[in-house]
Amino acid sequence: MKKFINQFSASLKNNILVFLAFPFVWTSCARDNPLSSENSNISPNAAARAAVTGTTKANIKLFSFTEVNDTNPLNNLNFTLKNSGKPLVDMVVLFSANINYDAANDKVFVSNNPNVQHLLTNRAKYLKPLQDKGIKVILSILGNHDRSGIANLSTARAKAFAQELKNTCDLYNLDGVFFDDEYSAYQTPPPSGFVTPSNNAAARLAYETKQAMPNKLVTVYVYSRTSSFPTAVDGVNAGSYVDYAIHDYGGSYDLATNYPGLAKSGMVMSSQEFNQGRYATAQALRNIVTKGYGGHMIFAMDPNRSNFTSGQLPALKLIAKELYGDELVYSNTPYSKDW
């Protein structure tokens, strides 16, 4: 995800979501599968993950990170599996919204650039068709060159920001969030209301987010200060509040030590970066299956890019073959960015 974020920043700062105090993005799993930790024997994150299971073709989930500055997320509908008839993609991650600081009101909030906001505002056109096919829609949250970030919020600020994330998910009927600790301008010493950036502070935010919306997905990038949450938060291990940990490109080591209690089903391995031509080998994909891991990620898939036929499409066919034992069907009806 690195290197594709600076372009978000300039427009983001002029498009801060002032409505944050009220709405937010996701209604996915919770609305379709109202599993609650209060009336279920499974943990909140197990409930969220259970809502994903059963709407997809296999236990291995394919995450597609869509660079919405350039790409229409509806392109994820172009790919199905021949035998099952189900979508290749299980989760679409909108890359990316941001975390920013409002100095006038001394609060941290979610900010969206015009591209992200257009998709959210017009969710009926761009997001609902994905969800109608059983694809979950997740909002990425990324640092944006100011004092606030994923990894430096005090407990009070983490609780408040988690509530804002819930509001956003509810407002836009989204299915969860993804935390990426990059591009923040952390300050030393930390200003009032912030703490020294740390994995523990990032874990606190993930924990508070799961507390605020237990039936939504909380996912993290295995990178920077979200790369491991080894210390329990209020006595709770990471596996109880992180649904999926998504490896950096090519990463394939087991994450049990990084996130105590996280099942293999929540580990997303051997990620690919399509824009840079960083593709996974057949063996890497087979290892996901044979070792019992739960996910795989592709970044920057776009049928309108020049390397689609030569690189992206063969990589997608290999995913269908190795992860699902199936054949890819490409509809050959790419969606352009029409906003």
UniProtKB/Swiss-Prot annotation:
- Residues cleaved off as propeptide: 339
Report the superkingdom from the record: Bacteria
Q: What class of enzyme is it?
A: hydrolase
Reaction(s) catalysed by this chain, per the record, are:
an N(4)-(oligosaccharide-(1->3)-[oligosaccharide-(1->6)]-beta-D-Man-(1->4)-beta-D-GlcNAc-(1->4)-alpha-D-GlcNAc)-L-asparaginyl-[protein] + H2O = an oligosaccharide-(1->3)-[oligosaccharide-(1->6)]-beta-D-Man-(1->4)-D-GlcNAc + N(4)-(N-acetyl-beta-D-glucosaminyl)-L-asparaginyl-[protein]
Q: Which terms in the Gene Ontology molecular function aspect does this entry carry?
A: mannosyl-glycoprotein endo-beta-N-acetylglucosaminidase activity
InterPro entries for this protein: Endo-Fsp, Glyco_hydro18_cat, Glycoside_hydrolase_SF
Q: Which UniProt keywords apply?
A: Glycosidase, Hydrolase, Secreted, Signal
User: What start and end residues bound the annotated signal peptide?
Assistant: 1-50
Compartment(s) where it occurs, according to its Swiss-Prot or TrEMBL record: Secreted
- Which biological process annotations from GO are given for this protein? carbohydrate metabolic process
Location of the GH18 domain: 60-326
Q: Which CDD domains match?
A: GH18_EndoS-like
The record's GO CC annotations read:
extracellular region
EC no. given is 3.2.1.96
Tell me the active site: E182
Family in the record: Belongs to the glycosyl hydrolase 18 family.
Please give the subunit comment from the record.
Monomer.
Q: Briefly state the protein's biological role.
A: Endohydrolysis of the di-N-acetylchitobiosyl unit in high-mannose glycopeptides and glycoproteins. Does not hydrolyze complex bi- or triantennary glycans. The presence of a core-bound fucose impedes endo F1 hydrolysis.
Q: What is this protein called?
A: Endo-beta-N-acetylglucosaminidase F1
The species this protein belongs to is: Elizabethkingia meningoseptica
